[in-house]
């Protein structure tokens, strides 16, 4: 994935979760039945909006840092994919878990949230630790 594509996808993800926050605020303000009168649904929609938005902005920072730190392209591509997919899994997992919840617990989609969080964490740690001359395990550069 190119640096430009990573930045564009990061900003698109931020716009998506920002729009979701505006929609959620409107639903709360209008007291829309079915959307926000259910406390568990409302909580998980808020979690998805907040986590997705923050992690999308984190991706903007990662996109910038990868260029500034001269991260090798083989590493940078893996990091870009991991952090973007991780942000989508965390935000989307919370939202989908809230929309498909049972009587007392979130729905099964929330199970992807920890995997997404680990992907983002791994990408940020790799961004911090990988140096310009480092090779990707397996010998590719």
Where does each model-flagged region fall?
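Polytopic transmembrane helical bundles with strong interfacial aromatic enrichment
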Residues: 1-141
